[in-house]
């Protein structure tokens, strides 16, 4: 039944991944050892999308955990859901990539990649009808960015017709981990543009803002941030894991969301936002969800869609929701804010419904938007990249691993192209093409 194989690479990827598995295990009624003790048949119906059934009523995630150093893996293994994963699926090196993209992509990571692909192959063979892969990683580091993109391109070679979704944590302007983030991110985007089918952009700063502003947490931990990300990941995949009236899968999402193959970088949001351990003290309605979902403060990437326009967007509602309410609200949003949607894609808002809400909520909604404003994110990284690359700062770390300066130049221009493509479609109107032909016609007569 349409399985998904999940990979998590690097420290960030493994921590987000661990939060995700903890989240969906709970939704499917699995305890921390993967034993089912749920209450509803619906939890079992499509368990096989993410879990293999082992002996003794135990379910094992189809997850491959990858890192170039053992530290994070040990933390996951010692964590509350560490016993869930298949021990053979932990693949790790000893040396670490040291936040160096070249180490992850060309040297250290390349040595480990065949081992990882063996595990991926084994997981894929255990599938009935594999739908695709999802990978969680960050773009600012060495392993998640360098080795993550290497894995994506290798998997692409071997499974060219399967979907490839990535949950990518983009370096944020204020919360910076290392000085070479702009290099790593630009080199990664260069890969993602070519090899991923859908990339959900998440950014730590936006997550911090949500924690401080909406959830009123004075000092958010990474645990809180990962909790938010796992809510979105669970929402995006909810249609695959539970029956619903209007189901969508990774491929349907891509068909509806990606008007031009290179423009597959999405902004995500989730509503209602509740802080961990404190469930909302009031009922949530569809209009309220819709309003919160389209609120720029709710986006998990630091770019404001009001500076651009939506090409397409998709809303996934969960819980006991009337189809009509949802349709009305969505139409309402489009009519009131028509200037924020490009007019040359009619019906560019897609909705999906699933009857099972997340734990502890009556209803929830997940938002996925393909907005031209995402270019702000790439612009920001691009400016930082240029500032350093102009001086050739820190380049020796990369050339020392066998990279060429040419690769940096290519990655930079590819990212700049991406930005200008977004800009071009933001400015495009409905009848521009016709005008062009009218202007060209008289020229031929003069000749």
UniProtKB/Swiss-Prot annotation:
Q: Please give the organism.
A: Colletotrichum gloeosporioides (Anthracnose fungus)
The task this protein performs is described as: Tubulin is the major constituent of microtubules, a cylinder consisting of laterally associated linear protofilaments composed of alpha- and beta-tubulin heterodimers. Microtubules grow by the addition of GTP-tubulin dimers to the microtubule end, where a stabilizing cap forms. Below the cap, tubulin dimers are in GDP-bound state, owing to GTPase activity of alpha-tubulin.
PROSITE patterns attached to this UniProt entry: TUBULIN (PS00227), TUBULIN_B_AUTOREG (PS00228)
Keyword Cell wall biogenesis/degradation found: no
Which keywords are on file for this protein?
Antibiotic resistance, Cytoplasm, Cytoskeleton, GTP-binding, Magnesium, Metal-binding, Microtubule, Nucleotide-binding
Q: Which SMART domains match?
A: Tubulin (SM00864), Tubulin_C (SM00865)
Q: Which residues bind Mg(2+)?
A: 69
Question: Could you say which cofactors this protein requires?
Answer: Mg(2+)
Name of one Pfam family that matches = Tubulin
Task: Give the subcellular location.
Answer: Cytoplasm, Cytoskeleton
Quote the subunit structure annotation: Dimer of alpha and beta chains. A typical microtubule is a hollow water-filled tube with an outer diameter of 25 nm and an inner diameter of 15 nM. Alpha-beta heterodimers associate head-to-tail to form protofilaments running lengthwise along the microtubule wall with the beta-tubulin subunit facing the microtubule plus end conferring a structural polarity. Microtubules usually have 13 protofilaments but different protofilament numbers can be found in some organisms and specialized cells.
A GO BP annotation: response to antibiotic
GO cellular component assignments: cytoplasm; microtubule
* Acidic residues compositional bias, start-end: 429-447
Query: Chief localization class?
Result: cytoplasm
Q: Where is this region: Disordered?
A: 426-447
Q: What is this protein called?
A: Tubulin beta-2 chain
């Amino acid at each position: 039944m349409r399985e998904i194989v999940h990979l998590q690479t690097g420290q960030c990827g493994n921590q987000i991944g661990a939060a995700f598995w903890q989240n969906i295990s709970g939704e499917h009624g699995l305890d921390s050892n993967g034993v089912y003790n749920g209450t509803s048949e619906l939890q079992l119906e499509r368990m096989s999308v993410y879990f293999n059934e082992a002996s003794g009523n135990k379910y094992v995630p189809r997850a491959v955990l990858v890192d170039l150093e053992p530290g994070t893996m040990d933390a996951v293994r010692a964590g509350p859901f560490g016993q869930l994963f298949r021990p053979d699926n932990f693949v790790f090196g000893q040396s670490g990539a040291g936040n160096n993209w070249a180490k992850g992509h060309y040297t250290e990571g390349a040595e480990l990649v065949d081992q990882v692909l063996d595990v991926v192959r084994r997981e894929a063979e255990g599938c009935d009808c594999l739908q695709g892969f999802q990978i969680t990683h960050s773009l600012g580091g060495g392993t998640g960015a360098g080795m993550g993109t290497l894995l994506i391109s290798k998997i692409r070679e071997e499974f060219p017709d399967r979907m490839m979704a990535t949950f990518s944590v983009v370096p944020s302007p204020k919360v910076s981990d290392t000085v070479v983030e702009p290099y790593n991110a630009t080199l990664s985007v260069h890969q993602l543009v070519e090899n991923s089918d859908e990339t959900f952009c998440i950014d730590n700063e936006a997550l911090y803002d949500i924690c401080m502003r909406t959830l009123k947490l004075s000092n958010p931990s990474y645990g809180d941030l990962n909790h938010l990300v796992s809510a979105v990941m669970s929402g995006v995949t909810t249609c695959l894991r539970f029956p619903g009236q209007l189901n969508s899968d990774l491929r349907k999402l891509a068909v509806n969301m990606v008007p031009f193959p290179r423009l597959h970088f999405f902004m995500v949001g989730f509503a209602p936002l509740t802080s961990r351990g404190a469930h909302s003290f009031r009922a949530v309605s569809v209009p309220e969800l819709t309003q919160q979902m389209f609120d720029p403060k709710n986006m998990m990437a630091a770019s404001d869609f009001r500076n651009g326009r939506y090409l397409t967007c998709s809303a996934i509602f969960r819980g006991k929701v009337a189809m009509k309410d949802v349709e009305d609200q969505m139409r309402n949003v489009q009519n009131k804010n028509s200037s924020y949607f490009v007019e040359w894609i009619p019906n560019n808002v897609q909705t999906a419904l699933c009857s099972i809400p997340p734990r502890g909520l009556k209803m929830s909604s997940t938002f996925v938007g393909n907005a031209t404003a995402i270019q702000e994110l790439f612009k920001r990284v691009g400016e930082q990249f240029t500032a350093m690359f102009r001086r050739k700062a820190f380049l020796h770390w990369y050339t020392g691993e066998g990279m060429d300066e040419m690769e940096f130049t290519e990655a930079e221009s590819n990212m700049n192209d991406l930005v200008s493509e977004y800009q071009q479609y933001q400015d495009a109107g409905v009848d521009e093409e016709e005008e062009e032909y009218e202007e060209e016609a008289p020229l031929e007569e003069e000749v």
